Design a protein with these regions (language model features):
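Nucleotide-activated sugar donor-binding and catalytic core shared by glycosyltransferases
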Residues: 1-330
């Protein structure tokens, strides 16, 4: 069994797919006291290179959601790694990479812990269910309402933020639009809806991810950007409109930014499933961001978001705090 607080630093294998999974693990990792020689396993991207700068990192080939051949390749890569290196424990926040890495670690006698994504409000993901069925790893949820004897509660990465007033408003706010980095999924509906609001202009910045090939957008357009540019564009904007991806939302909250999060839908080919609806619901409950379906996004909602910012309510993350507040934060 994996011990949450060992009382001393230890060499950990820290495993996460890029995007929200990696963002969560970076924020949660200090709870487990990883030593300086701990090793991160993830995919190579501008996000991972920025977040893990100065850390020991082992990159593996990208695994798309529910790519089970990719999971086998991930298992092989981590198995080879464990044949030459030793670790005191392995921790993962998902997604597909966890399915290969944690069983490989357990087969080498390494205690393993899987923490389900904050976006899974109503129960575990496919990855979580498969790992639970394997009986090979310790399990944690960031939502105590569905905790069980096996799925024990762990502190939420979102519960340490609250909304504050900026005392400013704008009828034509400067926008930064960011659509994440998940491969193979476009989000043209959101792009078109933003254009329809009439708020996009020459000062708008777009980070499109894999919604490439658009030639009808005013302002500056990028596919992917490093974390340093993401921070710069976010701070320069009056409002940041994002897909409801956990990684992006966490980054924005850490910057003190109150985001407008728009849900990707599986039925429109925008994601593997509809889990972004759950993270959008949580934003509404905690009142640390506006959230909307694509058709609900309009100029009034965007302009209203310009009135708010976010601040942290504790100085550092602590695994003993409640995973979800008893009532919405204000």
């Amino acid at each position: 069994m994996f011990e949450i607080d060992s009382g001393h630093d230890r060499r950990l294998l820290l495993v996460a797919s890029t995007g929200g999974h990696l963002s969560q693990l970076v924020r949660l990792a200090p709870d487990f006291r990883p030593s300086d020689d701990s090793l991160w396993v993830t995919f190579k991207s501008p996000q991972s290179e920025s977040l893990l700068a100065g850390k020991n990192v082992h990159y593996v080939p990208y695994i798309r959601p529910r790519d089970y051949r990719g999971v086998r390749r991930g298992f092989t890569a981590v198995n080879r790694l464990l044949q030459r290196e030793q670790f005191d424990g392995a921790v993962s926040t998902g997604s597909a990479l966890a399915l290969g890495a944690l069983p490989a670690a357990r087969l080498h006698g390494v205690p393993c812990l899987y923490i389900e994504s904050i976006s899974r409000i109503n129960g575990p993901s496919v990855t979580g269910r498969l790992l639970a069925a394997s009986r090979m790893v310790s399990l944690r949820t960031q939502h105590p309402q569905w905790a069980t004897a096996r799925w024990r509660p762990h502190a939420s990465v979102l519960a340490t933020f609250e909304r504050v007033d900026k005392h400013t408003a704008s009828s034509r706010p400067k926008l930064f639009i960011t659509l994440g980095t998940i491969e193979g999924y476009r989000f043209d509906r959101l792009i078109d809806q933003i254009l329809a609001t009439g708020l996009a202009g020459d000062d708008t910045v777009w980070q499109l991810g894999y919604s490439t090939g658009r030639t009808d957008l005013p302002g500056r357009v990028f596919d992917q950007i490093p974390a340093s540019d993401f921070e710069k564009f976010s701070k320069e904007a009056d409002v940041v409109v994002t897909h409801a991806g956990v990684g992006t939302i966490l980054f924005l909250l850490d910057l003190g930014i109150y985001p407008v999060a728009v849900v990707r839908r599986h039925e429109h080919g925008e994601h593997i499933d509809n889990h972004q609806e759950q993270i959008a619901s949580l934003l509404r409950t905690l009142e640390v961001g506006h959230s909307a379906e694509v058709h609900e996004l309009d100029a009034d909602l965007i302009c209203d978001a310009a009135r708010f910012a976010v601040r942290g309510t504790v100085e550092e993350h602590n695994s003993s705090v409640p995973a979800t507040p008893a009532k919405p934060a204000t």
